[in-house]
Each structure stands twice: as structure tokens, then as C-alpha cells.
Amino acid sequence: MVARLGADIYQDQEMLKEFIEGTGDMHNLFAWMVFRKECEALGCTSAKEVKKKAPQWRKAVKAVEFAYMFGAAAPTIAQSAKCSVEKAQEYIDSLDKGFKGMAEFARKGSAFVRKNGYIVICPYTGHKKYWWDHDVWLERQKSFTSEFWEDYKLNHKGTGDKTCEIVRQHFQAASKYDRDARNVVTQGTGAIIMKSAMTTLFNWIVDNNYFDIIHICASVHDELCCDYPKEIGDFPKILEKIMEEAAAKFCKSLPIPAEAAVGNHWIH
């Protein structure tokens, strides 16, 4: 769900095209963006051929993909992908160039949260995440004058003293909220969709006199685990419809399909 939701929120044309016109396989698309030359060497002419002709690069890109989607910097991606920081930065540059909508959303989100001290999670509901000590961070940012940095380089850099710790915490906080400005929006909107679906489902259960007959056992990320008697055979289709309609309230550019699976146990 998060990838489709991200495509809508970022209004990233490459992601939207892949979901609407392509295979919908983001691993293929990421591999094509990052390892295009390697994929072409194996006979791929487009992203849709990666899974069949270059599965090793589809597998290899996953560590880069997940870290990038969460807004990770080059050192983190290097650690995840087991490559040099320089190579990780090349991956980031390739993805920023390929996913222009996502990159622009991240840039604007970073500027907004640094200026205003909060992130708009979902414009449809007004949910926000606040940078709790943003006023302190902003004042400290103003104090970092050219004179401060000159003194820092001469007397503090590399000493591990209190000033070094203040500088470290300052930039660490900025990096955290830069990542949140992209990640919290998709994750948060996904959570709102799930809550909307669960509310609708609960009301349907009550309205149809299934209270204490159908049970909502667990919600994990974008999955709902329910217990119901086999006599209510159409319940899986009803649940799919409820979840898809909940997603459609918040994801306007493309559908987010739901798929029910029935069994005697559940494994996430």
C-alpha cells in the first residue's frame, strides 16, 4: 500500500506510470533506475523485463530501495547495500534523477518542516506531526554565524566537547525531520486509511448484527486479521470492498487494491 500511496502523494510520474500502465512492480523499476547498465547487459530493454532477465539486480536493489524510500542518507544506504559511501551517493543521485516527483516532495518537505516546525501528515484530515523543540533548534540555527564556525574549526572541532555535541545534535535533529517529512506522510496516511477501514468495518459488523460473531483480531501495518464463521461466506469480499473504499478516500490518482486470503491461521 505504501508504494502506491507514495506515488499519489509525491505525484511522481514514473511511479504512477508503473502502477497504472506497467507491471506495478517497484523492485523492477528501482533496479532499472539504479542498475540500468547491468540490466541492459543482460538483455533488458525496459523495467518490466528485469524480473525475468536480471533477477539478481532486482534482488540487489531492495536494500537501496527501502533505505531511499525512508529518506536515508548515503552512509546508511552504504551500510544497507554493503557498498562505499561514494557508490551509495551515486545510487541516490540516480534515483533523485529518475523519481523527480519524490525528490521534489522531499526537498519541499525538508524546507517546510525546518521553517514551520511541523509536518502535514494528511491534508484531508489535518493531522500533523510537530517538531517538539523546533523553537530551540531555530534559535540555535540563527546563532551559527560565520564567526561561530570560525571559532568552532579553530577551538572545538574534533575535541568532543560540549560545543561539538551541540552541533552534532543540531544536525542530527535536522536530518531526522528531513526523513520524517517524506516518510511520516506516507506511513501516517496509511495508518489513517487503516483506521478509516476499521471504523467502517466495525459499523458494518454492528449494523448487520454480527457483533461478537465477526472479530477484528489484529491490525498490522496494512493488513487486517479477522475471525468469522464460514457461514458468512461473502465476508472476504465485503472486507476487500471496505478497505479499497477507505483507501480511495485518501489516494486519488490510482486505486489501492485489497486482496483477502482465507485460512485457519494467520502469518504476517
Indicate where each model-derived feature is located.
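Conserved catalytic core of nucleotide polymerization and phosphodiester-bond processing enzymes
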Residues: M1-H268
